[in-house]
Curated annotation (Swiss-Prot):
Gene name as annotated: rpsR
NCBIfam families linked: S18
Ranges for region Disordered: 85-105
Annotated Basic and acidic residues bias: 95-105
Entry-linked Gene3D superfamilies: Ribosomal protein S18
Domain of life: Bacteria
Protein name as catalogued: Small ribosomal subunit protein bS18
Keyword S-adenosyl-L-methionine applies: no
Ranges annotated as spanning the membrane: none
Pfam families per UniProt: Ribosomal_S18
InterPro entries: Ribosomal_bS18, Ribosomal_bS18_sf
Keyword annotations: Ribonucleoprotein, Ribosomal protein, RNA-binding, rRNA-binding
GO biological process, one term: translation
Length: 105
């Protein structure tokens, strides 16, 4: 019975074809920012190989190149986020200030 299960497992496996293999890229250069940015998510993190379908060897090369590009300031460590803060509204409702203001009458 194990023999039949092994056959089913082999049939269901699909061959992984990565973007690097499709383009015929053998060497990953840290200066190629356009290529490296395809392997970074919106928060600036390196995408895992399960998502990118890159082999373990190529994933290590990618990681090394992305880290080098970050250290050389070619890639940001994190993506820019719009920081929103609540505006500081200073309202003075103290009775002393109301009395101190001269009336227009």
């Amino acid at each position: 019975m194990n023999h039949n299960k092994d056959k089913l497992k082999k049939k269901n496996k699909r061959k992984r074809v990565s973007f690097l293999d499709e383009q015929g890229i053998n060497y990953i250069d840290y200066k190629d920012v356009e290529l490296l940015s395809k392997f970074i998510n919106s928060h600036g993190k390196i995408l895992p190989s399960k998502i990118t379908d890159v082999s373990a060897k190529r994933q290590r090369m990618l990681t090394r190149a992305i880290k080098r590009a970050r250290n050389m300031a070619l890639l940001p460590f994190t993506q820019e986020r719009v920081r929103t803060q609540k505006p500081l509204i200073v309202t003075s409702n103290s009775p002393k200030e109301k009395e101190a203001k001269p009336s227009a009458q």
